[in-house]
């Protein structure tokens, strides 16, 4: 993927341990890099909190992220805390083989980073595009591990809230992994209170379409 002036350069080191090798992907709220964990000598994926339109950076001069407008500073800090909360949520399920592992997380460069296991494979969205139709028995075999992982997540009082083909990774050996816990919430924390609306049309349950829909397993 083509890099730009706000993506960290190849060779950049973070906390003296992780080296940036390139950009894997970019979204509205962050940049994901291919990195090397120098301590364990293995590839990792490094997700950087970088909400476009709120922050900027020119890597020709510095690696530090700058909030574009003073009035956005509070929103940026709240967003960064939610990002770190995502890391803590993922870390709770590091022993579950059906969930992408969060290996480390930290703050530096006036932003935050999540270090995750690096996975070779494609998203379920890409898989479905390439394979088009999947036999029911094959689909069940594919999804049972995901359902078991969701059962574990729910048993800990959490809901993912963003289950969709683009948040599920299919590995070369056929195993799948659930990704992206940015919308996850502890439903026991809210009791009968409603949660914010987060959904993907066609995949979200009916209660997520409602402002006061009670969410939970």
What are these regions (language model features)?
Residues 146-158:
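Protein kinase catalytic-loop region centered on the HRD/HxD motif
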Residues 124-134:
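AlphaC helix of the protein kinase catalytic domain
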Residues 109-123:
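Conserved short submotifs of the Hanks-type protein kinase catalytic core
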Residues 194-208:
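Conserved activation segment of eukaryotic-like protein kinases, specifically the C-terminal portion
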Residues 142-143:
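Activation segment signature within eukaryotic-like protein kinase domains
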Residues 105:
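Activation-segment/catalytic-loop signature of the eukaryotic protein kinase fold
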Residues 60-92:
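AlphaC helix of the eukaryotic protein kinase fold
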